[in-house]
Each structure stands twice: as C-alpha cells, then as structure tokens.
C-alpha cells in the first residue's frame, strides 16, 4: 500500500508521528503512516506557490489534457482504488467499483471540459476612451481537506475544479481513510508538473492547522463537520482566506398522502442506508403525512429489515461497517438517546452488530417528534427516523426548522404541490420523487450551517476563481 506523501513532485516519507490506519470491517490495523512534519507542510505549500507561477498561466487546453490523463489512469486502476477504499472504509467492494469509481472518473472528465468553457465577460466602453473586460483568474494555493466517508470521491470533487481553474493544491485526506488519496498522489505525480498537486497525511491539529493557516494559502476547501468548519473559519480569519465549506446535513424526506408508497420504500431503503448512512445527503429524516404514516412505517420497516450487513468483499453485502470505532459509539449513543424518550419506537435494528468490526444494524425509528435530537442532529449512520405531519404548511415549517440546509426531497403526485414546496425549502438541493441523485453538471452545496460554496458544475469551477476587472485606456 502506497503510504508516502507527495511534495513537490516527489514521494517522501512523513517525518512526524506515526498514526495507525484501521480496517473497519475487522478492527485490525492495516498499517502505520508517519504524519507530515511542520517543515513538510511548509515545503508542500511553498512548492505549490512556486508551481503556481507557471501552472496559473497555462492554457485551459493544457490543464484539460492533464485532467483527462488523470481520469484515464484512475479508470485503468479502478479495481486497485476500489479495493483500497473497501479495505480502508469498509465499503462493499462492488459498490466502490461499480458506483464510485465511474463517478470519480466522470468528475475529472467534466472539469477537463469545463476548464475550456470558463469565460470572463468581454465588456465594452463604460468610460469614454477606455475598454473594460472581466477576467476569471485562479487564486493561487488551495488547501483542500477531504472527509472519511467518500475519501477518493471528495478528493476528486476538490482537486478537479481547483486544478481546472489554474490553482495549485495541497490535499489533506482524513487521517482515518488516507489510502486512496495517497495512491492517487502516486499516479498524479507523473502527469502534473511538480508542486501542482501535493498530498499530505496527518491529523487536524498537527497537519491541518499549519496547512490552513499558512500565509501562502489563499483558499481553504473543507468537506467535514460543522465543528471543523467553525474551527477552520476562525483559524483562517486573521489571513482573510477564501473558504469553501460543505458541513453536513439532515435531509428531510417529505412524503404526502398521494405519494407512491412503494417508490418511497424502495428509495429510502437505498438512499437512507447507502454507505451505511454515512452520507450528508442521506434520506434520514422522514416526514410522513398522517394518512399514509402507518402504512409507510410498516412497509419501510419490513424493507429495511432485509438489508444485508456483511463483509465488504461479499457480493451480497449491502451495508458495510462504520468508518471508525469512535463513530460507531457516536451512532449507538444517538439511538440509545432516542430510545430513552419513551415515545420513539424501534421498528427494526437499533443495536450494534455482534462480532468484529464497527457494524451497526440498519435502523428505523418511528414516532419521532420535531424537537427530538434524532430529528434535529446529524447521526451519520444507518439510522432513519419517521415523523407524522398534518398538512403542507406544517411540514414545510418543520423541514426548514433545522440548522442544516444541504439536501431534501418531496414525494407527491401533485405537480403543483411539488413546485410550491420545492420553492419554499431552504436547502441547496431538492429532489422530487427521488433522492440522492448527483451529476457532475449540477451544483452540490448547502445553506445555513451546511456551509456555502458549490461542488461540481460550472458554479463549482467559478468558486475556485477570482473575478477581476481590467481597464485599458486608448
């Protein structure tokens, strides 16, 4: 397993403290990796800053060609990446290979094309004898912090638009799940000029803080928790860096009486529990109108009970383990608190799985109330709650009564209602009669404490640029 850092085009061993990397399916240590030292963090940023002088002036065509080459080598090494992701994260191998690798490749190919379509506004003479034009230029060095739930996917979301826009990047994957990012570094070093991509390993305090606080870093992009986002925003405030934050969610799933219940059940069984529920857009907070509440709870409970947890390399496995022991305890505590309310009923699941690994049973909780913690706080596990509602006005208010604002869905056969409700929901994305679907061409990002800035799409590319006005006297 590739365990070296990428700094200025060279693979080097970390010079800091060694940290264990676990297999969550067994709890065993896969290997130990040495963190980057403070000097290595500084060297990576300075290498990126030096490389920016040339990379920032390359043509969109040249940048696109590099991104396309990277997409090709990821595709060629898809099985290797899927196996690493499965071992390090506990994902079912078939899901990593069939679902995630193609999407990751597509992200790089999309931004390769988008790089050649990013234009400033060619303006005119707004002052006599002067011509104005608008440019969109890269910022410089971008520090990208990727999470542990989709390590390679999130690395792609951060690297592709930043590089396409002409920036240089220092990427820090989560210390829990670094293996695919380090493998990506090995392949990328022969495609991009030295210093354009740098990949470090380490914890937030030892590597993340000196990286994001470095005076030569001009932008920080994070996918992570609200607490981490708050810390980075505060930590970078003295240097007035641009920040790009995706900080989780608690997606409301609004099911009206006229919805296709079978479609809802099938959808939530998939969209609520994919990746063991470790997804910020997971369909985890169901609001069911009272006319169909009992039927939905009964049918969904039966469907969720058929989900198969198991070994990641088993083709029949639908849910793998959670990513760490600490996160398993977090999910278990949230469910135990829900049980303790007295009014929430466990329809299925509700406990850790016996044996090795960090497994939690797929869980459905009914009878949850709007103010319950299980409704208001992100669990980030295979746990879905169901709350009954009376009418459209009530459910829109309840759905918006949340600190999160990332994703939502509305299930109804009434087209007018679908439009009305979608227009009022305070979420970055609203799906109608589906959930969870993402494409490279459309933006992904939130509101409120879910953060700001967009991933994917041309909007995501623009986030990694600065708008400049150039005026020429003639």
UniProtKB/Swiss-Prot annotation:
It comes from the Bacteria. SUPFAM superfamilies: ALDH-like. The keyword Metal-binding does not apply. Its EC number is 1.2.1.19, 1.2.1.-. It is an enzyme of class 1 (oxidoreductase). CDD domains: ALDH_ABALDH-YdcW. NAD(+) binds at residues 146-148, 172-175, 209, 225-228, 280. Homotetramer. HAMAP family: Aldedh_Prr. 4-aminobutanal can spontaneously cyclize to 1-pyrroline, and 5-aminopentanal to 1-piperideine. PANTHER family: ALDEHYDE DEHYDROGENASE-RELATED. Catalyzes the oxidation 4-aminobutanal (gamma-aminobutyraldehyde) to 4-aminobutanoate (gamma-aminobutyrate or GABA). This is the second step in one of two pathways for putrescine degradation, where putrescine is converted into 4-aminobutanoate via 4-aminobutanal. Also functions as a 5-aminopentanal dehydrogenase in a a L-lysine degradation pathway to succinate that proceeds via cadaverine, glutarate and L-2-hydroxyglutarate. Belongs to the aldehyde dehydrogenase family. Gamma-aminobutyraldehyde dehydrogenase subfamily. This is Gamma-aminobutyraldehyde dehydrogenase. The lineage of its organism: Bacteria, Pseudomonadati, Pseudomonadota, Gammaproteobacteria, Enterobacterales. The gene is patD.
């Amino acid at each position: 397993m590739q365990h070296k850092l990428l700094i200025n085009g060279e693979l080097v061993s970390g010079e800091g403290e060694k940290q264990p990397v676990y297999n969550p399916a067994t709890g065993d240590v896969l290997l130990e990796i040495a963190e980057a030292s403070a000097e290595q963090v500084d060297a990576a940023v300075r290498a990126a800053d030096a490389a920016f002088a040339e990379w920032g002036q390359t043509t969109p065509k040249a940048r696109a060609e590099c991104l396309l080459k990277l997409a090709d080598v990821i595709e060629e090494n898809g099985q290797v990446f899927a196996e690493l992701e499965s071992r390090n994260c506990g994902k079912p191998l078939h899901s990593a290979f069939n679902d995630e690798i193609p999407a990751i490749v597509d992200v790089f190919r999309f931004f390769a094309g988008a790089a050649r379509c990013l234009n400033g506004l060619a303006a005119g003479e707004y002052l006599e004898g002067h011509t104005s034009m608008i440019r969109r230029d890269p910022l410089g060095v971008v520090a990208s912090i990727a999470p542990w739930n989709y390590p390679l996917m999130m690395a792609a979301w951060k690297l592709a638009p930043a590089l396409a826009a002409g920036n240089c990047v220092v990427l820090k994957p989560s210390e829990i799940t670094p293996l695919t990012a380090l493998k990506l570094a090995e392949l990328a070093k022969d495609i991009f000029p030295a210093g354009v991509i740098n990949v470090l390993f380490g914890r937030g305090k030892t590597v993340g803080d000196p990286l994001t606080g470095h005076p030569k870093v001009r932008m920080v992009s994070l996918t992570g928790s609200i607490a981490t986002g708050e810390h980075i925003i505060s930590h970078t405030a003295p240097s007035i860096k641009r920040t790009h934050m995706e900080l989780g969610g608690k997606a409301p799933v609004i099911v009206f009486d006229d919805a296709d219940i079978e479609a809802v059940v099938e959808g939530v069984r998939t969209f609520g529990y994919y990746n063991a529920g470790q997804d910020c857009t997971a369909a985890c907070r169901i609001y069911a109108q009272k006319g169909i509440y009992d039927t939905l709870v009964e049918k969904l409970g039966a469907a969720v009970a058929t989900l198969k947890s198991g070994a990641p390399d088993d083709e029949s496995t639908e849910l793998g383990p959670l990513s760490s022991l600490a996160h398993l305890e977090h999910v278990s505590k949230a469910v135990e608190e829900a049980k303790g309310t007295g009014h929430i009923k466990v329809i299925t699941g509700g406990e850790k799985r016996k044996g090795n690994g960090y497994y939690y049973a797929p869980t459905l909780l009914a009878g949850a109330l709007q103010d319950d913690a299980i409704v208001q706080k992100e669990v980030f596990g295979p746990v879905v709650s169901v709350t009954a509602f009376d009418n459209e006005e009530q459910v829109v208010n309840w759905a918006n009564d949340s600190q999160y604002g990332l994703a939502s869905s509305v299930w109804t056969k009434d087209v007018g209602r679908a439009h009305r409700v979608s227009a009022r929901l305070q979420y970055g994305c609203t799906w109608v009669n589906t959930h969870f679907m993402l494409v490279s061409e459309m933006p992904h990002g939130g509101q409120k404490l879910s953060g700001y800035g967009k991933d994917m799409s041309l909007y995501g590319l623009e986030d990694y640029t600065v708008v400049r006005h150039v005026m020429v006297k003639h």
